[in-house]
Amino acid sequence: MTRRTSAPETAGPIIEAGKNCWRQETASRFATLIDTADYFAAFAAACRNARQQIFILGWDFDRRERLHRADELDDFPDELGAFLVALVKHRPELKVYLLSWDFNMVYAAERELLPALRLRLQAPPRFHFRLDGRHPKGASHHQKVVVVDDQVAFVGGIDLSRWRWDTPE
């Protein structure tokens, strides 16, 4: 048996438009956000500038999480759910689409109960929140993506949720 010690020289690209992704685009800016403090600040800033739509996909979402924003100069609340609801109420053209995993009961002690119902009672009809429970047994909805006005995207491993807050310190 021969062991391979390096990748084959003929290896092609991993991502191929139309095959394993929709298309490829070039970003004019890119940054890595490691700490939740930086992510929440960038998320809040992007959302405050939103005019058309905000798409949020997450493994967990907790409307009670505080964004811990340094700039408390605007009139928007610091609590995540209230912040998003206020944005939608303030901007008549803005729509929010939020999809979160309908979690396993193992996580019930650390999750907010009935988040979709609570937000529906507060939010205008342009705020759409759904829980994803359609997946194989033992699986979960694990994407963590935010897209604002098709201009700014956050893709990675941080949920807009409790238990995620950290700083470089």
What are these regions (language model features)?
Residues 8-49, 53, 64-169:
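HKD-type phospholipase D/PLD-like phosphodiesterase module
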Residues 1-9:
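A short, flexible N-terminal coil/short beta segment enriched in small residues
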